[in-house]
Amino acid sequence: PEVYILILPGFGMISHIISQESGKKETFGCLGMIYAMMAIGLLGFVVWAHHMFTVGMDIDTRAYFTSATMIIAVPTGIKIFSWLATLHGTQINYSPSMLWSLGFVFLFTVGGLTGVILANSSIDVTLHDTYYVVAHFHYVLSMGAVFAIMGGFVHWYPLFTGLAMNPYLLKIQFFTMFIGVNLTFFPQHFLGLAGMPRRYSDYPDIYTSWNIISSLGSYISLIATMLMLMIIWESLINKRIILFPLNMNSSIEWYQNLPPAEHSYNELPILSNF
């Protein structure tokens, strides 16, 4: 269940970012989003043997674990389409945090599709312990969870520090990172389909070309990561203090000064619009 729980904080951040950047007070299908996360969390406990399709389970067991694993894709898909429905009808503002969110939705979907493919026990017998699995879980983790973390960081950095990062550099950094991670992990689908196994330190020469491209992508990602650190450093050095936030006040946290002062409220704030 660990990997399904791992993505839940990311889901929450993406919901916050997308609803706020859309200028809406909540996501589409707010209650359905909550039930979807509960369903993902609960189903995560009854699908463990999808890691064990190659150990010789009988056909009924394989059929069950294939089906149960695929059912996890349903609430996940509900979340994806609810985010898209939240964006519907708004003029999309391609701010850095919005770019990270859109990148998250797209790449997490790609990782989810390869996950549905791997859920098939008959196919998984061939693909088990190949780089296809590595490509799958890096699309949902290195481009799902990490993109959510990056999106959350650039979105709430002004709230935590009261300083602005350079949005132009942030966009350059996003696209550099996007190209880097895709160049790293997309060829691994091909390596897996060609039968390259996981957890070996060396490989036959036939796999060299895709591995070179994958390595090039990792260098690009490294450059993008260093660029991000440089952007944070530049922000802290130049101290561009935010005087007039342009945020839609769909959330109470943006009403205060940035960063919020101690004892901001004389009384408990009233919650409305459930």
Curated annotation (Swiss-Prot):
GO molecular function annotation: cytochrome-c oxidase activity; heme binding; metal ion binding
Enzymatic reactions: 4 Fe(II)-[cytochrome c] + O2 + 8 H(+)(in) = 4 Fe(III)-[cytochrome c] + 2 H2O + 4 H(+)(out)
Co-factor requirement: heme; Cu cation
Pfam families per UniProt: COX1
Keyword Magnesium: yes
Keywords, alphabetical: Copper, Electron transport, Heme, Iron, Magnesium, Membrane, Metal-binding, Mitochondrion, Mitochondrion inner membrane, Respiratory chain, Translocase, Transmembrane, Transmembrane helix, Transport
Membrane topology of this protein: Multi-pass membrane protein
GO biological process: electron transport coupled proton transport; mitochondrial electron transport, cytochrome c to oxygen
Residues where heme a3 binds: 136
Transmembrane segments: 28-48, 65-85, 98-118, 140-160, 174-194, 212-232
Enzyme nomenclature, EC number: 7.1.1.9
Residues the entry annotates as binding Mg(2+): 128-129
Annotated O2 binding sites: 4
Location in or out of the cell: Mitochondrion inner membrane
PROSITE patterns membership: COX1
Gene Ontology cellular component annotations, sorted alphabetically: mitochondrial inner membrane
Positions with a binding annotation for Cu cation: 50-51
Entry's cofactor comment: Binds 2 heme A groups non-covalently per subunit.
Matches recorded under SUPFAM superfamilies: Cytochrome c oxidase subunit I-like (SSF81442)
Pathway(s) annotated for this protein in UniProt: Energy metabolism; oxidative phosphorylation
Functional summary from the UniProt entry: Component of the cytochrome c oxidase, the last enzyme in the mitochondrial electron transport chain which drives oxidative phosphorylation. The respiratory chain contains 3 multisubunit complexes succinate dehydrogenase (complex II, CII), ubiquinol-cytochrome c oxidoreductase (cytochrome b-c1 complex, complex III, CIII) and cytochrome c oxidase (complex IV, CIV), that cooperate to transfer electrons derived from NADH and succinate to molecular oxygen, creating an electrochemical gradient over the inner membrane that drives transmembrane transport and the ATP synthase.
Record text on subunit structure and interactions: Component of the cytochrome c oxidase (complex IV, CIV), a multisubunit enzyme composed of a catalytic core of 3 subunits and several supernumerary subunits. The complex exists as a monomer or a dimer and forms supercomplexes (SCs) in the inner mitochondrial membrane with ubiquinol-cytochrome c oxidoreductase (cytochrome b-c1 complex, complex III, CIII).
Protein family membership: Belongs to the heme-copper respiratory oxidase family.
Entry protein name: Cytochrome c oxidase subunit 1
Protein source organism: Choristoneura rosaceana (Oblique banded leafroller)
